């Protein structure tokens, strides 16, 4: 079955998307190579958002799920996100250093070559409902460490978490650096049609094809993580109430 390719000429662009993108693009062009100290401070702010709002984040995810094990949220999302931020901070200096590359001296005698890491600009992230904290903050750790700015669109099935993050994030990072969006439904095509410098998507293959087609209109590079189901097997002799709570 082929995925639908949206006609972007007829897509209504929410004003908040365009306004935020323009603000982040302007901020990036005015200050396109943040220092190690600035990037480190951004990562610390991201970690503080998680640490200072742990209970509220867990509660919001539980509301979106209807009922979700606190243990699962903490160990598959919360601690994983903190570890990603910590790892980025620990490796940041090394990641920012220029890297030497070999040059064929027969072809280019006396030449030297090196790769200088540079920020891309404004990065978009489309987050699914199943692991909404992990799949927003883990990429954000890399995005901010690389000196970029980010717009994050949450799933329409993560309304409570999206609203919470949208209200919390400006207290830790300015909106021209990071902004979360709630998806009231049907806004994905508009988001993926923005001229990002890179776009990350996690979800189904069918939706991934549509996202890639939209991004192609702007020659936006994309990273697609395309998945399926996460089955759980409950043995006949295991207590059903305990299984339901943990799953």
Residue ranges and their predicted role:
Residues 112-113, 179-197:
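A structured beta-alpha segment of the ubiquitous adenosine-cofactor-binding alpha/beta core
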Residues 104-172, 219, 241:
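Conserved small-residue-rich beta-alpha loop and adjacent elements
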Residues 162-165, 191, 211:
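Hydrophobic packing residues within well-ordered alpha-helices of enzyme cores
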């Amino acid at each position: 079955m082929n995925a639908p390719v949206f006609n972007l000429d007829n897509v209504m662009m929410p004003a908040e998307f365009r306004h935020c993108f323009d603000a982040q693009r302007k901020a990036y062009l005015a200050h396109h190579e943040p220092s190690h100290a600035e990037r480190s401070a951004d990562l610390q702010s991201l970690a503080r958002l998680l640490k200072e709002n742990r209970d509220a984040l867990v509660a919001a995810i539980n509301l979106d799920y209807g009922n979700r094990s606190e243990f699962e949220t903490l160990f598959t999302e919360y601690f994983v996100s903190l570890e990603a931020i910590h790892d980025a901070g620990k490796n940041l200096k090394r990641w920012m250093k220029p890297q030497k590359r070999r040059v064929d001296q027969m072809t280019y005698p006396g030449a030297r070559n090196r790769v200088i890491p540079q920020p891309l600009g404004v990065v978009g992230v489309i987050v699914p409902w199943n692991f909404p904290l992990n799949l927003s903050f883990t990429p954000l750790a890399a995005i901010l460490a690389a000196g970029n700015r980010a717009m994050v669109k949450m799933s329409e099935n993560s309304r409570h978490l999206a609203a919470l993050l949208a209200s919390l994030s400006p207290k830790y990072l300015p909106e021209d650096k990071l902004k979360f969006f709630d998806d009231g439904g049907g806004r994905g095509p508009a988001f993926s049609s923005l001229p990002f410098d890179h776009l990350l998507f996690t979800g189904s293959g069918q939706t991934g094809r549509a996202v890639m087609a939209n991004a192609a209109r702007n020659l936006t590079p994309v990273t697609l993580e395309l998945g399926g189901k996460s089955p759980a097997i409950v043995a006949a002799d295991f207590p059903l109430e305990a299984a339901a709570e943990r799953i």
